[in-house]
Design a protein with these regions (language model features):
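Long, well-ordered core segments of solenoidal/helical folds
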Residues: 34, 88-98, 151-161
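Soluble non-cytosolic domains of exported or imported proteins
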Residues: 19-20, 24, 54, 58, ...
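Structural helix-adjacent loops and short alpha-helical linkers that scaffold large soluble proteins
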Residues: 72-84, 139-146, 178-183
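Beta/coil-rich, acidic/histidine-enriched accessory regions frequently appended to metallopeptidases
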Residues: 158-199
């Protein structure tokens, strides 16, 4: 599937299960939030002949993938146990297929390099786990009053489809809108690429 600023194209095999179909459609739907609504200047007027990549694929794809799963449990399409199984599978795949720890911001900025293209699919695995961790931190610090969806709404209100952000300002902005612990987490695990202890 491929999203564009005014449309989405999706091609499916006839043999695709209904669960997989829901997963893909949910993911593509949440691209209306990011990157179609919240995105950086690097991708706002994307030049396919001279591409400049953003450092924030962890948000564009990871947060989107997390929302695609969270939406399904929130709407009763899957159970909480199924949601947790999906996230556990992502943890397993991230460790098995992409054992080398890497800075997600560096990978994102350099995703056109062949070496980085090989690990790009990890944004759908570890990227979703990073988003879940951010959600859990926000929920914990706010006593369950807020989550990552609230953060994305705030970013959407600040920026939007016609007002992109500077790549360098996103993490400080997220920290200001949430908690220092969120900024610390992003710095340690997304920017530095330290291994996450999910325990």
């Amino acid at each position: 599937a491929l999203e564009h600023n005014k449309s989405t194209t999706a091609v499916f095999m006839q043999t695709m299960s209904s669960n997989d179909l829901i997963q893909v459609i949910s993911h593509e739907f949440f691209h209306t939030l990011t990157p179609l609504n919240v995105h950086s200047k690097e991708i706002h007027d994307f030049d396919f002949n001279n591409p400049k990549m953003s450092a924030h694929l962890w948000m564009y794809e990871g947060v989107t993938e997390y929302f695609a799963n969270l939406f399904q449990v929130n709407q009763g399409l899957i159970s909480e146990d199924e949601f947790l199984a999906h996230m556990a599978e992502k943890e397993s795949l991230a460790g098995k297929l992409y054992p080398k720890e890497v800075s997600f911001t560096e990978m994102s900025k350099n995703v056109l390099d062949p070496e980085m293209q090989e690990i790009y699919p990890n944004v759908y695995q570890k990227g979703a786990l990073l988003a879940m961790c951010i959600d859990l931190i926000i929920r914990d610090k706010s006593n369950g009053q807020k989550g990552i969806l609230d953060l994305m709404r705030q970013l959407s209100n600040m920026y939007g489809p016609t007002k992109p952000f500077d790549d360098a300002e996103l993490i400080p902005t997220i920290t200001k809108l949430t908690y220092p612990e969120v900024g610390d987490f992003i710095q340690k695990y997304i920017v530095n690429g330290d291994p996450i202890d999910y325990a």
